[in-house]
Amino acid sequence: MTVLANLQKLYGGTYTEQNLLLSGTHTHSAPGGFMMDLLYDISTLGFLQETFDAYVDGITMSVRRAHENTRRGRIFINMGEVEGANINRSPTAYENNPETERRKYASNVDKTLVQLRFDSTEGQPLGALHWFAVHPTSMNNTNVFISSDNVGLASLLFEQRVDPGSLPGKVTHVASCHFAEERGCGSFVAGFASSNLGDVSPNTRGPRCEKSGLECDVSSSTCSRDERCFSSGPGEDMVSSTRIIAEKLLDKALELFNDRESSHEIKGPVRVIHQYVDMPQAVASVYDPQTRTFKKVSGCLPAMGYSFAAGTTDGPGAFTFKQATKTTNPFWNVVRNFLAAPKLEDEECQGSKPILLETGRLKFPYSWQPSIVSTQLAVLGDVAIACVPGEFTTMAGRRLRDAVSGAFAQKGRGKVHHVVVAGLCNTYSSYITTKEEYDVQRYEGASTIFGPHTLQIYLQQYERLAEAIAIGSPVDPGPDPPIFTKRLLSFITPVIFDSPKFRYGYGDVLLQPPREVTPGDKVMARFVSGHPRNNPRHGDTFLSVEKWTSNGTWAVVATDANWETRFEWIRTHKTLGTSEAVITWQIPPDVVPGDYRIGHFGDYKYIFGGVYPYSGFTRTFKASRGPAGASSRGSTPSGGYRGKREEGEVVEPASGYRSNTSKS
């Protein structure tokens, strides 16, 4: 809603709830505290306004850039199969679906990558948007760095292939588009968005016991008492696994992108429809095979099952919870009832789910999970995009595609040949499984918050939206979702002040990089730093890797958005407010020989008020493609660190390359 309000301030009624579709590309390695529903913010100690504002401002900026660079163009759709990039992490739940239904599909996950290619009318590629069913959990829950994971890396790699001179994002203070001769401006945009990934994992080696390496119990995903069960990816560690999955997506995406013959041009009008739904009040009809009649079913108040606390094989949970749990525990029931005891009608509504958290009755200090969700359907020519408010499992997504396609076919007004499930749209309401998967009560079923008939309600809701679009009939907007921004709580302390290390200034280098490096080396530098929460640096960067050019200037070759760089912030003293930034650059195999330096940019909070920028740079170091010590052409920049310290030695105060700070 805040993004929409921002856009309406800029463009009036151009953007509305009807036509603005926000679907998370999704990652499990990003700052939390922005969801507003309490359950989703508990792990981050509540709502964090700085994180919320950073996301809102970033999304608004992206839409604004797109709006102000609108061009006439053409859209093409193509699709292909990606092998070895995903597995089903709840196969026992999937197997509970009807055998006749499962026989229709070759796999228990969707392997199809769908691509929309955007070209200008002159044939210039403008962008490519993809949907593929895989969780962005290659970076596991031991990771402490912000990462866009496998789908984010695939996006970056795609952009670099199409526009090899570009930098991800924009570095306004050192490398704006006037450096286009050296580095491109990055006008091409690639994205890999979420689809029906609810039960889909990128950790293709499958679940194993942590110590013994034995297979986990297939039903409960457990091992012996002293072992955890988790899945791992195809690489030697989570970083290499992320890259392997990303490159699999990239390879197929590039193949589709360059295959003009099998691409189909999308022609026709753009139509969108949107409606809010109060899920606990929603009803649907289901067929009862015993009575051979249809009966009415309804949604439930939100609730989480016991298996929710067990986590998944991508990220195991806490305590002794197990997946596929269908009974309650007296101890945890006491804890549950202290918060909010479920009523008999709640337990009956949730069916086979033993309730661990009756979130629908938890209203203090505000809502724990949403009851009113956004549903939206967009149609581009003969392509329909079902924007769903959660994570649909493989079979749930397949049923949704069939339902939407069937609704358009029944009305017979403009055929829809392709239906895409766009996950995590507008509202997040956890998972959506089939009724059969729900009854198994794996993690996904326990997290299907509106009960066993959630999917059936959504199927009939999206059928109604499809029928309304097909005949050109409007729908009522539905109930307004609650707004409780004034009641949000946060237990995260704000940044009180920063102070530099004694006898140093902000941006001063504490650890210099080695003098000479070669491909594969990891170059590390450490700086005196302020708190990164002082400024999210939208369109900017916390670090730069710069190369000395033949025309006597520094050109940025990498920022904090590049995969080969890493920015680590460390609070060295909580009371004094001192901190350091550790910047790492892994030298790529295609590095251009020459002289380089690493820069750090940030802002510090002055103890008597105000936030002020600073910057600092390392000494110059030489990169070569051969053994260390190989020479490279070009003049040597002046002003760099030229002391006699050994490589990697800590820099003493008032030595080396000094920082630039600003305070007025």
Give the positions of each predicted feature:
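Non-catalytic substrate/cofactor recognition surfaces at enzyme active-site rims
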Residues: M1-G634, G639, G643, K663
